């Protein structure tokens, strides 16, 4: 009985040892038996330990300085990747940019030897203190850019390259549209920290355009940055202002807006080359006037509604519309002159006959009406002379009867021909007058643009090419 009892105690003891051995089996062996998951590498353990040590007691709402009076210096730079759009109507400039910021965070320093030689870590920007630098002249309410990771070095240097899409306000000067040159600015600064707490240092005066994607309508002539200060009643705030000088590429508007307008302007002159008895003269002038109105509406949709400046092309269109309106009035007057006769109007004044039948035709290189009538009459007498003499000899009594009627008909025909010739003289006179006015008006309006391009845009473009 004693032997049997000792055997039972030995079995219980062996069973207890096996149970204890199974309960205290290593966790890694248990996981390996269940799923075969590997252990963390040494580098991952070091980085995990580094993050725990750095951010265990880190407060991202507090400025990372050793003393309260210390100033954080922010190195600030700007890189532009795309000039998306320039909205002249709403006076907005849309850009895709990268904000480059660098500062020292004294709370994020470590010894690389204590963490497996780790010198750089990537930290989300919403996990540490970042400067609240925003675009002041923002137009859509989005003052900040995207939230991305920062690069933190062992000495506490934090580098943050932040992509952003901005719509900034830009005062558009459309005086020389579409040959205009605009100067748009972007002003950055801290929203809450004054200059005694955060100082902004301009890293590079030139905007980085290494990854710039060209715009089909605008070309950046220059993009420069400058540092300034804005003050209020108690404090001063440092700010960085970038000025973008952009030039419009005018080829599209030249081909589809300016050239058609100039063509319509000179088409008005052609109206006076049509015969005065053609009713299509009024129709042509009216069609030109309607076309110019359509072009004016197109320009009104593009440019801002401002009374400070009037675009050059708008002035030219208004000038041409006045030009066409006057041509319609003159054409109506010429047609009225053409259809005059002795039965509808009084006799022609002597000064009208002298000026329009003798002097003006010579000045306009036209054949004189008196010369043409004399030649036609002379030829008629030569052709019908013998027959007329034979008729007079044979029917002298009949000639006396009809002479009064023939003379009257000749007088009526001469008056009608005189008025028609005056209408031709008026058409020729207005043809040269309107052609001269059209040329002078076109040159007078577009010469300032040519002068501006020759003295401003071309030298800047040559300077950029040499660089």
UniProtKB/Swiss-Prot annotation:
Disulfide bonds join 170-184, 234-235. It is found in: Synaptic cell membrane; Cell membrane. The keyword Glycoprotein applies. It catalyses: K(+)(in) = K(+)(out); Na(+)(in) = Na(+)(out); Ca(2+)(in) = Ca(2+)(out). Glycans are attached at residues 155, 183, 229. Residues 451-467 are extracellular. The keyword Ion transport applies. Activated by a myriad of ligands such as acetylcholine, cytisine, nicotine, choline and epibatidine. The chain crosses the membrane at residues 255-275, 284-304, 317-337, 430-450. It comes from the Eukaryota. One of its GO terms (biological process) is response to nicotine. GO terms for molecular function: acetylcholine receptor activity; acetylcholine-gated monoatomic cation-selective channel activity. Residues 338-429 are cytoplasmic. It is a multi-pass membrane protein. Coiled coil: none annotated. Keywords: Cell membrane, Disulfide bond, Glycoprotein, Ion channel, Ion transport, Ligand-gated ion channel, Membrane, Receptor, Signal, Synapse, Transmembrane, Transmembrane helix, Transport. Pfam families: Neur_chan_LBD (PF02931), Neur_chan_memb (PF02932). Residues 1-29 form the signal peptide. One of its GO terms (cellular component) is acetylcholine-gated channel complex. After binding acetylcholine, the AChR responds by an extensive change in conformation that affects all subunits and leads to opening of an ion-conducting channel across the plasma membrane. Component of neuronal acetylcholine receptors (nAChRs) that function as pentameric, ligand-gated cation channels with high calcium permeability among other activities. nAChRs are excitatory neurotrasnmitter receptors formed by a collection of nAChR subunits known to mediate synaptic transmission in the nervous system and the neuromuscular junction. Each nAchR subunit confers differential attributes to channel properties, including activation, deactivation and desensitization kinetics, pH sensitivity, cation permeability, and binding to allosteric modulators. Neuronal AChR that forms heteropentamers composed of two different type of subunits: alpha and non-alpha (beta). CHRNA5/alpha-5 subunit is only able to form functional nAChRs when co-assembled with another alpha subunit, can be combined to CHRNA4/alpha-4 or CHRNA3/alpha-3 and CHRNB4/beta-4 or CHRNB2/beta-2 to give rise to functional receptors. Interacts with LYPD6. Belongs to the ligand-gated ion channel (TC 1.A.9) family. Acetylcholine receptor (TC 1.A.9.1) subfamily. Alpha-5/CHRNA5 sub-subfamily. This is Neuronal acetylcholine receptor subunit alpha-5. It comes from Mus musculus (Mouse).
